[in-house]
């Protein structure tokens, strides 16, 4: 099994055009050093992948959070598709080992350079879209990105506690309290449960990997309750 067969097995998709897959992992420095091979770099695929990623993530957020304001969805999407997040996704599936670099870029540490890794993730999305279609891109993101959204990893970019405070205090002063109800799971993978109480009435409960995430989740539930009355 060569490295490209290994990569396809790793991501769970077969490419009809393996050259397109190779291009997604080809840095311009490699092209400059292999001009006789007529290879193409990944910059155009990165351009396309960036747009496909924004569309698919936007669609997921739009459907998952039907009551979230546009501004908050924008902030959340920005946190998901920012360079540090893309690097995390690329590292999780060991993309760096497949990147084709020029010797100079390799010596300069390009294989672990964050911007380069983020670009490769986007160019792979572009190649996957061209070769397999948008549905397969969504299937891939359902394994790599969407579970992190579901787990609340990006909720800190959306301050539901502030939103809730603004909603309930529009007409009167109220007392908002948050209680941590308990925790479950082993030390390395804890989950916390929280509730939000407004003027003595429990309005929402939620859970999260941290106490802050649990409180944010409870506030989000309370907002949903209030806006659907």
Swiss-Prot record:
<keyword id="KW-0698">rRNA processing</keyword>
<feature type="binding site">
    <location>
        <position position="122"/>
    </location>
    <ligand>
        <name>Mg(2+)</name>
    </ligand>
</feature>
<dbReference type="GO" id="GO:0003725">
    <property type="term" value="F:double-stranded RNA binding"/>
</dbReference>
<keyword id="KW-0255">Endonuclease</keyword>
<feature type="active site">
    <location>
        <position position="122"/>
    </location>
</feature>
<dbReference type="Pfam" id="PF00035">
    <property type="entry name" value="dsrm"/>
</dbReference>
<dbReference type="Pfam" id="PF14622">
    <property type="entry name" value="Ribonucleas_3_3"/>
</dbReference>
<keyword id="KW-0507">mRNA processing</keyword>
<comment type="function">
    <text>Digests double-stranded RNA. Involved in the processing of primary rRNA transcript to yield the immediate precursors to the large and small rRNAs (23S and 16S). Processes some mRNAs, and tRNAs when they are encoded in the rRNA operon. Processes pre-crRNA and tracrRNA of type II CRISPR loci if present in the organism.</text>
</comment>
<feature type="active site">
    <location>
        <position position="50"/>
    </location>
</feature>
<keyword id="KW-0694">RNA-binding</keyword>
<comment type="subunit">
    <text>Homodimer.</text>
</comment>
<dbReference type="GO" id="GO:0046872">
    <property type="term" value="F:metal ion binding"/>
</dbReference>
<dbReference type="GO" id="GO:0010468">
    <property type="term" value="P:regulation of gene expression"/>
</dbReference>
<feature type="binding site">
    <location>
        <position position="119"/>
    </location>
    <ligand>
        <name>Mg(2+)</name>
    </ligand>
</feature>
<keyword id="KW-0479">Metal-binding</keyword>
<dbReference type="GO" id="GO:0006364">
    <property type="term" value="P:rRNA processing"/>
</dbReference>
<keyword id="KW-0460">Magnesium</keyword>
<dbReference type="GO" id="GO:0006397">
    <property type="term" value="P:mRNA processing"/>
</dbReference>
<dbReference type="GO" id="GO:0008033">
    <property type="term" value="P:tRNA processing"/>
</dbReference>
<comment type="similarity">
    <text>Belongs to the ribonuclease III family.</text>
</comment>
<feature type="domain" description="DRBM">
    <location>
        <begin position="159"/>
        <end position="228"/>
    </location>
</feature>
<keyword id="KW-0378">Hydrolase</keyword>
<dbReference type="GO" id="GO:0005737">
    <property type="term" value="C:cytoplasm"/>
</dbReference>
<keyword id="KW-0963">Cytoplasm</keyword>
<protein>
    <recommendedName>
        <fullName>Ribonuclease 3</fullName>
        <ecNumber>3.1.26.3</ecNumber>
    </recommendedName>
</protein>
<dbReference type="GO" id="GO:0019843">
    <property type="term" value="F:rRNA binding"/>
</dbReference>
<dbReference type="InterPro" id="IPR036389">
    <property type="entry name" value="RNase_III_sf"/>
</dbReference>
<dbReference type="InterPro" id="IPR014720">
    <property type="entry name" value="dsRBD_dom"/>
</dbReference>
<keyword id="KW-0540">Nuclease</keyword>
<feature type="domain" description="RNase III">
    <location>
        <begin position="4"/>
        <end position="133"/>
    </location>
</feature>
<dbReference type="InterPro" id="IPR000999">
    <property type="entry name" value="RNase_III_dom"/>
</dbReference>
<keyword id="KW-0699">rRNA-binding</keyword>
<dbReference type="GO" id="GO:0004525">
    <property type="term" value="F:ribonuclease III activity"/>
</dbReference>
<keyword id="KW-0819">tRNA processing</keyword>
<feature type="binding site">
    <location>
        <position position="46"/>
    </location>
    <ligand>
        <name>Mg(2+)</name>
    </ligand>
</feature>
<dbReference type="InterPro" id="IPR011907">
    <property type="entry name" value="RNase_III"/>
</dbReference>
């Amino acid at each position: 099994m060569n490295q490209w067969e290994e990569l396809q097995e790793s991501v769970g998709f077969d490419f009809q055009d393996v050259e397109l897959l190779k291009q997604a992992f080809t840095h311009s420095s490699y092209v400059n050093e292999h001009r006789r091979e007529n290879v193409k770099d990944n910059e155009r695929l990165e351009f396309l992948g960036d747009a496909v990623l924004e569309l698919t993530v936007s669609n997921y957020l739009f459907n998952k959070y039907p009551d979230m304001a546009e501004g908050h969805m924008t902030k959340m999407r920005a946190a998901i598709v920012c360079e540090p997040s893309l690097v995390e996704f690329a590292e999780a599936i060991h993309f760096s080992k497949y990147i084709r670099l020029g010797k100079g870029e390799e010596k300069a540490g390009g294989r672990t350079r964050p911007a380069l890794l983020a670009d490769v993730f986007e160019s792979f999305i572009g190649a996957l879209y061209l070769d397999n279609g948008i549905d397969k891109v969504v299937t891939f993101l359902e394994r790599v990105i969407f579970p992190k959204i579901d787990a609340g990893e990006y909720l800190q970019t959306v301050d539901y506690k502030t939103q809730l405070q603004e909603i309930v205090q529009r007409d009167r002063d109220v007392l908002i309290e948050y209680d941590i109800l308990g925790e479950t799971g082993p030390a390395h993978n804890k989950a916390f449960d929280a509730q939000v109480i407004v003027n003595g009435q429990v309005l929402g409960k939620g859970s999260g990997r941290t106490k802050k995430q649990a409180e944010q989740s409870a506030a989000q539930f309370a907002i949903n309750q209030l806006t659907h009355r």
